[in-house]
């Protein structure tokens, strides 16, 4: 029977060969030389495919004694003309998923590969956690060693500011008793314990008293200038209350109270009328007015190597609107008063941290220290960074101290996104774009610097 089977197979094989020979021998007569050649090549390819099919093992996974597969993959799998790039990639991934260890195969049956242990995923998560903890430790170290100001230095700087404020208040009451002012008070990041690196800056707010029936404020977006975040202070009822009815009529330009003229008035007092060397000698400080254009600024040396800058900031309050005489960056808007949002922003930040013992203020102080120590980030202001944190606080609820690294990275990504859009809306007044005073070039430089550091944020801590 075996012999008959072998003869039958051989007969079948010879029959196919005889048929092929007959076709090839007669093709020349019918198709000519060229056609016969093409038909011969095609017929030979069919015969090789037939030979491979009848010679392949019954199981494609049966192994030879060497442990490798006993049949080779078809040559067309490597042909660049038959496989495009996507197919090659898919094929490569498919081949890589096949087990290559010989122990994964049995000589008779195919055993599916064992699933990867869940421990590997846990190891990846652990590695990420270690990287996050490493950044967390670096952030805390940076804050302790670079950003935080010693309590003693803060106290001495505040005391110097309080002493100078008291002297200025006494002088104004004595020399200009008719100037309607409320009590001056200190403000700024040093006063709110949000200053970083050095205790070198504080603001002295000088509130003007305006008659409510003689003055009104007009939002900048409602004017032809269309500048949200700024206001015009207009003189009202001039037909019933003529010029001179208010002390501050002397600072009116074109029917509006000019912050520049108000600042010039105080400059004459601060820089020209007060004997600061004598006051400094009395207080054991070195005090001198800053040179122009910082007209309303005092430079104070309260210790041998400690300096403090005090900014005098005239302020007006009309209803619920608080404005300060900090000019717009562009000169054509020097008649506008700036809306004061910093006190409300700081109060919200402090309230959020007090509610859950969060790390929002800590994250903000680290960002401020980085920007203060990195010249390329010098255009970013404390208000902009504060609003980035406030926006992030609306998205993320967990601000526990161990989440500092995650929130720091999120703040960086958020800041980059705002720079990319060119818009950072105020968290308290979304109509105000806090990037409006930056030039496109400055925005590009800030975004580029932060984007380059995103892959390795530790670089920011080395400045």
UniProtKB/Swiss-Prot annotation:
Claim: Phosphoprotein is one of the keywords in the record: yes
Pfam families from the UniProt entry: Mab-21_C (PF20266), MID51-like_C (PF21297)
Chain positions covered by the region annotation Important for interaction with DNM1L: 160-169, 234-243
Positions contributing to ADP binding: 187, 189, 201, 340, 342, 368
Cysteine pairs bridged by disulfides in the record: none
Mitochondrial intermembrane side: 1-23
InterPro entries assigned: Mab-21_HhH/H2TH-like, MAB21L/cGLR, MID49/MID51, MID51-like_C
GO cellular component, one term: mitochondrial outer membrane
Membrane topology: Single-pass membrane protein
Keyword vocabulary terms for this entry: Membrane, Mitochondrion, Mitochondrion outer membrane, Nucleotide-binding, Phosphoprotein, Transmembrane, Transmembrane helix
Function: Mitochondrial outer membrane protein which regulates mitochondrial fission/fusion dynamics. Promotes the recruitment and association of the fission mediator dynamin-related protein 1 (DNM1L) to the mitochondrial surface independently of the mitochondrial fission FIS1 and MFF proteins. Regulates DNM1L GTPase activity and DNM1L oligomerization. Binds ADP and can also bind GDP, although with lower affinity. Does not bind CDP, UDP, ATP, AMP or GTP. Inhibits DNM1L GTPase activity in the absence of bound ADP.
The protein, known as: Mitochondrial dynamics protein MID51
Organism: Mus musculus
Gene coding for it: Mief1
């Amino acid at each position: 029977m075996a012999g008959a089977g072998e003869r039958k197979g051989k007969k079948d094989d010879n029959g196919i060969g005889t048929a092929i020979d007959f076709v090839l021998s007669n093709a020349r007569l019918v198709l000519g030389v060229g056609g016969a050649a093409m038909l011969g090549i095609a017929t030979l390819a069919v015969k090789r495919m037939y030979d491979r099919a009848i010679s392949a093992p019954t199981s494609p996974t049966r192994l030879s004694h060497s442990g490798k597969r006993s049949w080779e993959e078809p040559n067309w799998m490597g042909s660049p003309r038959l496989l495009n790039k996507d197919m090659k990639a898919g094929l490569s991934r498919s081949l890589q998923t096949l087990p290559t260890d010989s122990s994964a195969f049995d000589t008779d049956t195919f055993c599916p590969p064992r699933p990867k242990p869940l421990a590997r995923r846990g190891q990846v998560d652990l590695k990420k956690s270690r990287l996050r903890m490493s950044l967390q430790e670096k952030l805390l170290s940076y804050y302790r060693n670079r950003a935080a100001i010693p309590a003693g230095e803060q106290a001495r700087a505040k005391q110097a500011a309080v002493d100078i404020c008291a002297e200025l208040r006494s002088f104004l009451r004595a020399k200009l008793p008719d100037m309607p002012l409320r009590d001056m008070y200190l403000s700024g990041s040093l006063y709110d314990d949000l200053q970083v690196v050095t205790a070198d800056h504080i603001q002295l707010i000088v509130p003007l008293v305006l008659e409510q029936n003689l003055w009104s404020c007009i939002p900048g977006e409602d004017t032809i200038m269309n500048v949200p975040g700024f206001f015009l202070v207009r003189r009202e009822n001039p037909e019933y209350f003529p010029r001179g009815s208010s002390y501050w009529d002397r600072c009116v330009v074109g029917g509006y109270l000019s912050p520049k003229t108000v600042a010039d008035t105080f400059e004459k007092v601060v820089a020209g009328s007060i004997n600061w060397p004598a006051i400094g000698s009395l207080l054991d400080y070195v005090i001198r007015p800053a040179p122009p254009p910082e007209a309303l600024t005092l430079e104070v040396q309260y210790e041998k190597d400690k300096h403090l800058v005090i900014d005098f900031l005239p302020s007006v309050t009309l209803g619920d609107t608080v404005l300060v005489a900090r000019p717009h960056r562009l000169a054509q808007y020097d008649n506008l008063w700036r809306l004061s949002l910093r006190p409300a922003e700081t109060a919200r930040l402090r309230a959020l941290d007090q509610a859950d013992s969060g790390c929002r203020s800590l994250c903000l102080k680290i960002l401020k220290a980085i920007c203060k120590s990195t010249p390329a980030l010098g255009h970013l202001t404390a208000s902009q960074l504060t609003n980035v944190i406030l926006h992030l606080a609306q998205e993320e609820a967990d601000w526990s101290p161990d989440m500092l690294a995650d929130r720091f990275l999120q703040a960086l990504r958020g800041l980059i996104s705002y720079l990319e859009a060119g818009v950072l809306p105020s968290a308290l007044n979304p109509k105000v774009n806090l990037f409006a005073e930056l030039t496109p070039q400055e925005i590009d430089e800030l975004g580029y610097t932060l984007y380059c550091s995103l892959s390795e944020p530790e670089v920011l801590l080395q400045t």
